[in-house]
Amino acid sequence: MLSISNAPTVADTGERILAAAASCVVDFGVDRVTLAEIARRAGVSRPTVYRRWPDTKSIVAALLTRHVSEAMRDAPLLGDDRESLVRQIVTVADLLRRDRLVMSVLHSELAPIYITERLGTSQHMLIDALAARLAVAQRTGSVRAGDPVQMATMVLLIAQSTIQSAQIVEPILDADALAGELAHSLNGYLS
């Protein structure tokens, strides 16, 4: 019998579910992930999964938000100026472009939902973070005047397009060239 101190916590269960979902997305592609397989891999019942997320799309959305948050954490902002912000954006874009889960979602039937039909949680999170950082850079004079939220949204569109299209332009723009051109585009837009 498990003692209370050895029983899995609610957070542990949620983490197991997310880890199981991530492995399903990578193994099968996002279009073939089932809630039953997520539950099986997590070692929990389907009702346990349903208590946390209403459907598979919600779990995938939570995973995307987590991966975007991790990319932002792994690419810290090293200054308040435009160049530092652009370096961070380019690094985040590169991390997301190399993320198997993110790319699986972007190449799935769900992609239009995340790209063209609505802004998701992770996109709102990025816009908010970018807007705050752009406002600081505007105060230092390294970013042009303008509505920080609108500018952040445009930066998101530029970076998102780069991430989505990187694979098709790879014969022309390798990873280093892509990063350089993205930085040039962003510096030009924000100057």
Residue ranges and their predicted role:
Residues M1-F28, R32-R41, K57-A61, S69-E70:
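Basic, helix-initiating cap at the start of DNA-binding domains
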Residues S104, R139-H184:
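Hydrophobic/aromatic-rich alpha-helical bundle segments in the mid-to-C-terminal region
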Residues W53, L64, A159:
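DNA major-groove recognition helix of helix-turn-helix
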Residues A62, R73-R100, I115, A152-V155, ...:
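Hydrophobic alpha-helical connector segments
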Residues I113-T140, V149-T153:
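Amphipathic alpha-helical packing segments from all-alpha helical-bundle domains
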Residues L106-Y114:
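Short linear capping/connector segments at secondary-structure termini
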